[in-house]
Amino acid sequence: MQTFRLTSTGRNILRPDELAFQPREEIPYKSFHPDLQIDEPLEILEGDHTQYAGLRDSLVTYKSENSYVLKALLNAKIENVKPVGVQTENINPQEKKFGYKTAKQLDWSPDEYFKFVAIHPYSKTSFPVSYDLDELDTMWLTYYNEFQLSSNSEWENVSKEFLEIVLTIIEREWLYLEAWMPKIEPVRVEDELDGRCVICNEAECENSNAIVFCDNCNTSVHQNCYGIPFVPEGQWFCKKCLLAPHEVICCAFCPDRDGAFCTTLDGRWCHTICAIAIPEISFHDTSRLDLVRNIASIPKSRWKLVCCICKLRWGTCVQCSDKNCYAAYHITCARRAGFFYKIYSHSASYDSVDMETYCDKHTPPDYLNGLMKRLFPLAELYYKRMATDVPLNFQATKAPDFVPEGPWKSHPLPAFIVDKVTKVLLSYNVKRQDLPSIVTDICKFYHMKRRSRKDAPLLKSQLLMDSLENLPVRASKDRVRSLEVAKALQDQYQSLLTLVESTAKRQLLKCQLSNLRKKFLNLNYFPAQRLLQDTLVKIIDLDVDGLFNMPLDNGWIGWVELKRQVFSYQIGSISSLEKKLEPIWDVDGVIQCIDDMEQLTAMVQFAQKTEGEVKKLFIKAKIYFESLSLDERGNLKVPSLGINGLEYDNWPGLNELEMSQLDIPSQGNLKSLHDFIEGLDLNEKIGKFPISMFQNQVAQFSTIEIPKMSGRANGMHNFHSEDVTGQSNHALPNSVTKKNGTKQPYTKNSLPFNERITRSKAKKNYS
């Protein structure tokens, strides 16, 4: 490294490695003027002025036209170049409405740099085009036209002016939409610590050490804590907002992305509080607290510490100042969680500081009036949300050479903006058959470009920003409209809630109806199955200790397997179930299978005790099963009742042809059924229908299509018809015949008690 030395003393007077980053007013003057001696008086020179008498004449001679300097200069030729007008004749006349001017209307900028522009009111259609295409836009437009032309020979190329118009409308509508949408603030500790310095965590300030707020991120710092020599007039920005306002940066020593940042000598970012808290590093520029150095001197053991708050192995941690505590945490995490820490500076420039910090167990209980209890859950929630942004390869190693960034997420354009752009273009009579598809493709390109720019806007026009300020956000009409929309949404929500509840009730009733149908089918077609299941459950309940749960070698299959076979319809008779239970009563077989005498004794006693009781259960089951009215197929006979509650005979065709209730009858069967119905007495008929209608049904027979059905026929359906008025035309009996052969007029009490009950049930079912 080059240095300068005095020839007399040999002392270094200029060291670039130390003075390159120092302000000029702080560098010693001898570094610039090493021979200047301020203690010695200056020498005064006296002499005759005659030796300077010809100086003025020589200067005049130098400036004369005969000077050899002017003769040596080349003669410059000035050529007047006529300005070339902008070629605007090829612009579509419809596109000129968006602010494009012809060559005759071009206004050349005057010599002055001040121009007063009137702020136009907010308008969605009257606006000039403020977007200019760049190289990327031109390349995409060329590729898009070539791609469309390859698939469609009649394709009309999209002009550059059209693309500028569409991108301007999209950008305006997107900015207006963002202005209307409410901002969602993240979980921030600064709301709890409003007005405190983010470095020393103190709110007290003095005239020479005031708290300064950043005009962009609102970060509050002391002058001495952040190296601010004086409070500037006007706006002040922190180092992060001044050097990288649109970038997402991370600290090299912690995962926190908020706070006061400074730079390192190797070009990275870190928090000022992190540089103060870590004892191995220091500031190269102590006056501005910037340029952190000696990062390589941090031991590896500090890089391997895991923070007890964010649970991330990222950067370097500090440890609790208690001599018996080894809790490690980032100092920024400690501030978010409300831990106690205090900075002790031995000078005003923070060139030598000491920090005292304590974990949650050793923090004084009266610190910040119990603020730690509120901030600690917020800090854990903040780092849980951010944990997905930290790659795994950085969790198990020391701080990387570069700051990792997660994938930037940009929001896609809503369909509202796409429709809005199309409507604006149609309002200007921009007529193209493929206009919606072109606008959609341009919106996709706009979304990808915003994503590549990390969601930065494409336009930064002051006129557009002024129009955003004039948005009628607080207009009374809009608030009334918002209330109306909210009321309509609330009504729709209530209707939807009612519909969902009704749907849930309907599905519940359907489920109950399905279960009832299943039970009815089981009772009708498997009458013995319910009897077997109930009998088996009673027998299993007798084995309280579960002695016969497991299968045995004598043929016993166990309660679990036996229950599965019964409930899966593999055992269909009482005799089959008795055979399955015979190994339990076989005492000799049980003795041969069990070696444990205590268990064997209990099983034999259970078999001897319950054998008689089980046989009684089987006898009762057989008696009940024999009392059931079954047909020749083993199905339960369901009585057929008329609308008047009286039982009547079924159609004999089913029994004669040995048909099932689910079989489809032929045309001959239907004819026989028709004759049977016509032969019934008027009091026995359920309904009447024209013969022509029945003949048409027989002629066009594909499935059983008979008029409305009700009642039962051999466990299935009987027929019922209605007249034109919608009233059933069934006939009621005029009189009732008693057992002794006498007749009496029909009344409600004319029937026996059981028949009245049957009839009342039938009427209830019919209604």
From Swiss-Prot:
Its main location: cytoplasm. Residues 724-767 are annotated as: Disordered. PANTHER family: BROMODOMAIN-CONTAINING PROTEIN HOMOLOG, PHD FINGER PROTEINS. This is Mst2 complex subunit nto1. InterPro entries: Enhancer_polycomb-like_N (IPR019542), EPHD (IPR034732), Histone_Mod_Regulator (IPR050701), Znf_FYVE_PHD (IPR011011), Znf_PHD (IPR001965), Znf_PHD-finger (IPR019787), Znf_RING/FYVE/PHD (IPR013083). SUPFAM superfamilies: FYVE/PHD zinc finger. A zinc finger (C2HC pre-PHD-type) spans 248-281. GO terms for biological process: chromatin remodeling; DNA damage response; regulation of transcription by RNA polymerase II. One of its GO terms (molecular function) is zinc ion binding.
